[in-house]
């Protein structure tokens, strides 16, 4: 099969809009009608072309797609969910050729379902939020939360990829690793030293191929430092590097934070987060396109294995068990037809933080009282299923700036056509950068929080665990269609105390689970949110930033000064971090809330594992994608070793 199988030759989506965009259909229509089409997704560079193949296969490509609806099919391993962890597991379990593997994915191929929104880095925001006007249910579950008291009773859209690649095809492409202390705390929590930082590192290295800042030229004032010991030369399937274009505002933020005493970090992948740095992304530095679990792990598996079978557009209804409580397969539904797929060795759930616990519960694994209320026979009474959900929010003020930013893409009649031409012809310009390329992490400083709150954080988290992350967001929190340049100094809470839940009110996985993250439910989180917002304002008001800020704060505006006013603004405008974890938490055998053991095996049954972010015992500081890839590598290696 030729490498152009999924080549997109015309602009498939409307241009990106500002973060949290409430799309103005009139503006979009008039803008789109005058744009040059987004051309073929390949550069003229020969090496880049070699690095760019998408769907190729060993033998017939069609041999890797399962026979839908045929009875009696069984495989050694059945993986539910072709996302971040699922495709990494599929690649490793099928790699030596001795085991047959089936991947069951509810969605399809994002290249055909979402076009360039999943390929061009800056186009990620096209479907990043749901405002009722622009929507694509082909590659997202369109999950909504219950009304959130901490967020002005809003029912929040919660992005969850429903596609091969999962949320790696939907998210912000940010790649980093947690702090050393976070992984050591994981090891202590589950009673397994294989989760300490030094034991994690080989799996981090095995999952990614790092291309340093020297791969593409960078401005002299945008130096990116890296600890090269965090990566290996051989690396793994997932390309990690820096966006080709550096956001102009980021060098100003770098200078401002340096003057404020933030130390320079070495890339956020060596286990040390505290400090400031340009951040790496899962972007192929040669093609300047999004890299996903599908374009990396799945591509490798198809090219090098002949024992992998993929079932797309197929929803898993429940896990099947024999009378010894061993998982023997799954019941699935493909376009209304219900049938079964058998598992000779194990079933592996990689359906994510919301749908892995849902699948457990409809299969009889979960809180006994809740399952009995729904008439579901109880197979394993695990009270922790669906509990312990942890996530954070992103917040911050917006100001006009004197340098070009991504906010110009909407409303400026010259900027977007120019950006498309630059991307088409040279793979450069605004579209190569998703809009957030500079981060900082900080512990709470004296006086930022109440003494009691600071003491609680110090008692609950390791010394190297940051309290806040700061993001130089090259856009606005609320869209401005005037074509001007705006910048949002943003923050996220790294030590939230609020805990949410995922529950069900139906025994049918076609019905969405009930998701209640409980953002800002804990008063300490509210206090941290206000402190983070004030810190963002402090950065923007610094001497360095005054030179580039073009006017007064536009959002929320200088009239918001008291803690109550700021908290109300945060409640009304902040958004999900889309980094939920913990709903099938890993723990020790005597932990009443544990769902899986340290080998990811579901307690109380046999032949069933979960490998995804739902088994994190707690939220790692920052984005979880890098840790999910490494977790899949770790569990797969242990399974292949007979554990």
UniProtKB/Swiss-Prot annotation:
Optimum pH is 5.5. It comes from Aspergillus parasiticus (strain ATCC 56775 / NRRL 5862 / SRRC 143 / SU-1). This is Versicolorin B synthase. It catalyses: (2S-3S)-versiconal hemiacetal = versicolorin B + H2O; (S)-5'-oxoaverantin + H(+) = (1'S,5'S)-averufin + H2O. N-glycosylated. The keyword Transcription regulation does not apply. Residues 1-41 form a propeptide. Keywords: Cytoplasm, FAD, Flavoprotein, Glycoprotein, Lyase.
